[in-house]
Amino acid sequence: MKHLLSIADLSRDEIISLLDEADRFKEVLEGREVKKLPTLRGRTIFTLFYENSTRTRSSFETAGKWMSADVINISASSSSVKKGESLKDTGLTLSAIGADAIIMRHPSSGAAQQLAGYVAPGGVGPSVINAGDGSHQHPTQALLDALTLRQRLGGIEGRKIVIVGDILHSRVVRSNVDLLSTLGAEVILVAPPTLLPYGVENWPVRTSYDMDAEIRDADAVMMLRVQQERMQGGFFPSHREYATLYGMSKAREASLKDSAIIMHPGPMLRGMEINFGVADAPRTAVLQQVSNGVHVRMAVLFALVAGSDATI
């Protein structure tokens, strides 16, 4: 595996291998006062973010540093991108400096694929990891969600996973649909008609407008943020009406079966798609998702950068 651009690029065995590797990293680091491994010593990793990020960026940086890599952060707002430099020239510059991997977030779908073509023609050059490209893909988020589901539910195959919210603009849901269906889960997407994408009937999912009917027997409910920054308005009448129909209220949380968990990729809009108290409930796995993100990203960096003869 040279790059990680999309969940669709991974086989079922590769997905399971990455999840197993993430579990191994968690086990090795657990209880250590100094969380440091020599695995990527001497390697140089760049994070290149054209959009804001808290969890993904800091998680990748932590993963690299815990593996002793040199991690260099670049924000588009403070780089030559502000002067009009193209994605191609930015990527080639980082490659010339000596990047072993470039982790990129970009507002345009397909940008990660473009960057990989620029910096590693013929497979020679730095690895590219897609940290989110437009509404297209966010593969490491889907991997950390799968790891969380596996840990909390004991497995994914045959489980009913309900994803609620802004399906239209979500790269997270597209990656999760690919991954969860590959691992044998039943995936149901719940949203108002205006927030379901064209062609969703061809996805390996079932769709519904009725949140209450779908969540009662769900094993996990994943809430999505309404991405207002990608909207011009008119997708739903008001925030209050949206929260009433598609928010995880205390009453809805109480209607879930005892073993069900609630997830959210973040950032959460408390009071809109999830109630303030529910966000902190014991069955809510948000912080476990964040913690798992570091171990999943360690596993991805290990697979792409460490080399075939490397050991943890």
UniProtKB/Swiss-Prot annotation:
Q: Where does carbamoyl phosphate bind?
A: 55-56, 105, 138, 141, 266-267
Q: Which UniProt keywords apply?
A: Pyrimidine biosynthesis, Transferase
* Pfam families reported in the protein's UniProt record: OTCace, OTCace_N
Q: Which GO terms describe its cellular component?
A: cytosol
Indicate which residues the UniProt annotation says bind L-aspartate.
83, 171, 225
| Gene Ontology MF terms in the entry | amino acid binding; aspartate carbamoyltransferase activity
Reaction(s) catalysed by this chain's protein: carbamoyl phosphate + L-aspartate = N-carbamoyl-L-aspartate + phosphate + H(+)
Q: Which InterPro entries match?
A: Asp/Orn_carbamoyltranf_P-bd, Asp/Orn_carbamoylTrfase, Asp/Orn_carbamoylTrfase_sf, Asp_carbamoyltransf, Asp_carbamoyltransf_Asp/Orn-bd
TM segment ranges? none
Keyword Transferase in the entry? The reply is: yes
Listed EC numbers: 2.1.3.2
Q: Which Gene3D superfamilies match?
A: Aspartate/ornithine carbamoyltransferase (3.40.50.1370)
This protein's pathway reads: Pyrimidine metabolism; UMP biosynthesis via de novo pathway; (S)-dihydroorotate from bicarbonate: step 2/3
Q: What class of enzyme is it?
A: transferase
Per the record, the similarity remark reads: Belongs to the aspartate/ornithine carbamoyltransferase superfamily. ATCase family.
UniProt cross-references to NCBIfam families, sorted A to Z: asp_carb_tr, PRK00856.1
Physiological role: Catalyzes the condensation of carbamoyl phosphate and aspartate to form carbamoyl aspartate and inorganic phosphate, the committed step in the de novo pyrimidine nucleotide biosynthesis pathway.
Assembly and partners are described as:
Heterododecamer (2C3:3R2) of six catalytic PyrB chains organized as two trimers (C3), and six regulatory PyrI chains organized as three dimers (R2).
Q: From the Swiss-Prot or TrEMBL record, give the protein name.
A: Aspartate carbamoyltransferase catalytic subunit
